[in-house]
Amino acid sequence: FSGHAANWKGYLKGIEAGDKYALELWNTIQNDAHYKGKTTLFITSDHGRHLDGVKNGYINHGCDCEGCRHINLLALGPDFKQNKIFTHQRNQKDIASTIAYMLSFQMATSKGEVMMEMFK
């Protein structure tokens, strides 16, 4: 919510809190014998943010600007390469196709591509 409130300091604190929650979740998974080494975690967002100079900047989103069209993805799990950052562009539909691939089901009408570069 801090992003929409035009509170940059709060926005950064929100990102920091989200990072801590993600780490806590991953550590919980890794400390559970049932899930450790067998669980995949995808963390992403449903949209990006305006870049500086576009409309009202980071406090909003929703157009087709460069910032709104890009999201981050953190993918953790035993099937993925570790400590790698992939910088080529992907689309949200590629996330769905990758998850479908991992679960061994077809998405016949999907236009997404499996993100094979992430796999070991």
Where do the language-model regions lie?
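Substrate-binding rim/cap in mid-to-C-terminal beta-strand-loop elements of soluble/periplasmic
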Residues: N60-L103
